Regions:
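Short, intrinsically disordered low-complexity segments
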Residues: 1, 13, 26-27
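Bacterial N-terminal signal peptides that target proteins for export
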Residues: 1-9
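Bacterial N-terminal signal peptides
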Residues: 8-17
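Sec/Tat signal peptide C-region and signal peptidase I cleavage site
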Residues: 18-22
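Non-catalytic cap/lid and distal C-terminal segments of serine-dependent acyl enzymes
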Residues: 23-30, 34, 40-69, 74-367
């Protein structure tokens, strides 16, 4: 009798489960199931897509967008696609704007809380490509207390392969991002770690530590934070050569403005200066800025102490080109020894990656 009851209960349970399964609606297959949100085509164009069937408007923004040229989307079956021609190899941040709301690519494995990264590298042989067959350095996020700003801040620190097991003291490059970015920019979209790893593995650069501080604050306060907080932190926590001949500063765009602020406020503290797509703040009178920074007196001090002072631009299409020209004209007037370079890729991360590639090969080699 007990066996019959147990069998009846089992059969009833099985029938109920089949009934529930039959009543559960099957999910409808949509184009989103097979959608690849970023595609690089053989002709060098890149297509960015998002599934938004109920959206009224969708747009795309990112580092790879042609300057001043909006891209009109094509919508089909709820998929909005944007085709961008002639995308240079590189890493690009991007996001969609759906009915006025920022949306970070839900299909991308690189999407974080506030960004998505598209890697366009068809050959895998670019100077910034990741090479699995070489030693790799370490990238650390370091937190420090800024007495200058009265708050906790972060910086990224790249140390070369073998640093942890070594004993030698190394020179330091302080590498600053541009406006609207943070210390995250150079290691991600700027591919700094891969560029440095490749150069070191090929014997093209001096082993060094590269510090990428957060420049997203008032320019004059950044200079104070760098000198009073960032550099002392590095020199207390890493094996570094703590003298001007083994200390370099470099920054792009807004970071270039900060670079000039740093060197003219501290003309005897850095042996190498690279200002990338930068100049003096375009919103201020350059003569007043020259007076504030005492550039005429400090130029002589810089000439005596600095082994290399380089100004770069991304060519006439670089939005800081005029600002750079103004700075160069002033430097000519005051007798500052500097070198000028142009990379014809505009105000883009492709330009600045080339700059870092060139710069890193030259730093700390002059006697």
């Amino acid at each position: 009798m007990r066996k019959i009851i147990a069998l009846s209960v089992a059969l009833a349970t099985l029938l109920l489960s089949f009934s529930a399964s039959a009543q559960q609606p099957q999910r409808r297959i949509t184009p989103n199931d097979t959608l690849k949100s970023v595609r690089v085509l053989p002709d060098g164009s890149a297509v960015f897509s998002i599934y938004a069937p109920k959206a009224r408007t969708v747009s795309l923004t990112g580092d790879m967008m042609p300057w001043g040229q909006p891209i009109t989307p094509v919508e089909k079956d709820g998929v909005w696609s944007f085709s961008i021609p002639n995308v240079k190899p590189g890493s690009y941040r991007y996001h969609f704007i759906v009915d006025g709301v920022q949306v970070y690519d839900p299909k991308s494995p690189t999407t974080t809380q506030n960004t998505a990264l598209a890697v366009v590298d068809p050959s895998g042989n670019e100077f910034f490509s990741y090479r699995p067959d070489i030693p790799h350095g370490a990238l650390a996020v370091r937190t420090y207390w800024s007495k200058t700003l009265g708050r906790t801040r972060t910086m990224r620190v790249w140390t070369p392969a073998g640093y942890e097991a070594g004993k030698a003291k190394l020179p330091v490059l302080y590498l600053i991002h541009g406006g609207g970015d943070t210390d995250v920019a150079w290691p991600t979209v700027g591919c700094a770690g891969d560029i440095l790893d490749n150069l070191l593995a090929d014997g093209k650069m001096v082993p060094m530590i590269v510090v990428m501080p957060d420049g997203s604050c008032d320019i004059s306060m950044f200079e104070k934070d760098l000198m009073a907080d960032v550099i002392p932190f590095i020199e207390s926590n890493y094996r570094v050569l703590a003298d001007k001949d083994h200390r370099a500063v470099s920054g792009l765009s807004m970071g270039g403005i900060e670079t000039l602020e740093v060197i003219f406020q501290n003309p005897d503290k850095f042996g190498y200066v690279w200002c990338l797509s930068g100049g003096f703040n375009p919103g201020v009178d350059i003569q007043k800025e020259a007076e504030r920074l005492n550039v005429r007196t400090n130029a002589a001090i810089i000439n005596k102490n600095c082994k290399e002072f380089v100004m770069t631009q991304g060519g006439p299409t670089d939005i800081t080109y005029v600002s750079g020209e103004r700075a160069n004209k002033l430097f000519d007037e005051i007798g500052l020894n500097y070198e000028y370079q142009e990379v014809g890729e505009g105000h883009t991360w492709y330009t600045w990656k080339i700059n870092l590639y060139d710069e890193a090969q030259r730093l700390f080699k002059k006697k």
